[in-house]
């Protein structure tokens, strides 16, 4: 290598160092390869006005850019893989079946709560027993019917008789209305004395059957009692009631006169 080439190389080293610093700053600020290329091209165009680059300088600059550009290569972010959500399973605790929702599980559980039809029992499978005829049962009920009819006939055939005139009436209300005439005197005026005596005797017999009757006591309770009193003499010649105060004589008491000769 000639001395002129050596001098040119030594003069190129400081300039190359400055170029490396500026290129590194430009590459670090760029976000992509194209933007860094545009910046370097603009920077190279500005520097061409000062001095023409040689082929060796261009080659060295290209190698430097390639070496630095490989280190700053940015890897594209890989798309995240979204896993499909696993559907939740709702399992029946009775039969073990799985369902996609809780509502479906609830509807299935209602089928377990419904009572299953019970199998037919032996009593239901047994043949039916033949029932006796209705005509065989009816005769047994006839005596009761006849007895009730007899009692009703006896009640209807009862005779209501007046104890005063011995008349008969079909009902008790008619007999009561008839007896009211006896008490008012309408029938008693026309009745004979014998009938009245018989009625009085019948009433006395009815009254004697009761406790404490007027016939046994020989007095009538409707008549006021006669007051009982006893006279007793007093020492002074006055009459007094037994339980009352002294009764004064209506006449004035006269003193005895003394006769003088």
From Swiss-Prot:
Pfam families: zf-C2H2_6. One of its GO terms (biological process) is regulation of DNA-templated transcription. Highest levels in the root apex of wheat seedlings, lowest levels in leaf proximal region. It is found in: Nucleus. Keywords: DNA-binding, Metal-binding, Nucleus, Repeat, Transcription, Transcription regulation, Zinc, Zinc-finger. Residues 26-51 are annotated as: Disordered. GO terms for cellular component: nucleus. Coiled coil: none annotated. InterPro entries: AZF1/2/3-like (IPR044653), Znf_C2H2_sf (IPR036236), Znf_C2H2_type (IPR013087). The keyword Calcium does not apply. A zinc finger (C2H2-type) spans 90-112, 160-182. GO terms for molecular function: DNA-binding transcription factor activity; transcription cis-regulatory region binding; zinc ion binding. SUPFAM superfamilies: beta-beta-alpha zinc fingers. Potential transcription factor which binds the nonamer motif 5'-CATCCAACG-3'. Possibly involved in regulating transcription of the histone H3 and H4 genes. This is Zinc finger protein 1.
